[in-house]
Amino acid sequence: MIKGVKICGISDITTLTHILDHDFPPKFIGFICDYKKSKRYVSYERLKTLLNVDRKNTNFVSVLVNPKNEVLERMKKLNFDFLQLYNVEPKKTKMIKEKYGIKIITALTIIDQNDVNEYKNYMGISDIFLFDGKGYEKSIGFDHKLLNSVPKSLNKMIAGNIKLDDIPKFNDKDIYVDLSGALENEDGKKDVNKIDRLLNLVNK
């Protein structure tokens, strides 16, 4: 059974409230905080309003791509539960974790086995390892068989072009599953019906 799900790319209060009020809210909700190329990007000013809600038992995740110090200082003020870091070296990741006293999701973008093996450099630093496809906002998948070499005990999450119909195949794996694009309509907006389907499916 999967550990739970992360719904990523939330950018409006209506969708956020709907998710948090669901009978089976997700373990994580992700917000794109500094990658302005993404259609899901949320500015700092909007985040201050958006995050002023009762999180209940859901972890709020700030998704960052090699963030500058001023960005990290802003994120600190928003009291996120996790920072999800792309393109951040182990040494800097450790510094961020120690300085800000926050849990870390290290995001590794995967094409081949060498990319997967990068997780070893973050052992003892990262709290969760996210294995994602290349492309950031483009949601590109990768061969999940590449993860067969990863210890089952590793706290891991999988993302990258995962569809709702893919969820059942993960049901025997001790992982978190991260979805974004699969929960959107043709206009690129989150579809609450698809979100409901996901949360009900995971909690059958």
Predicted feature residues:
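Conserved N-terminal beta1-alpha1 strand-loop-helix module at the mouth
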Residues: 1-204
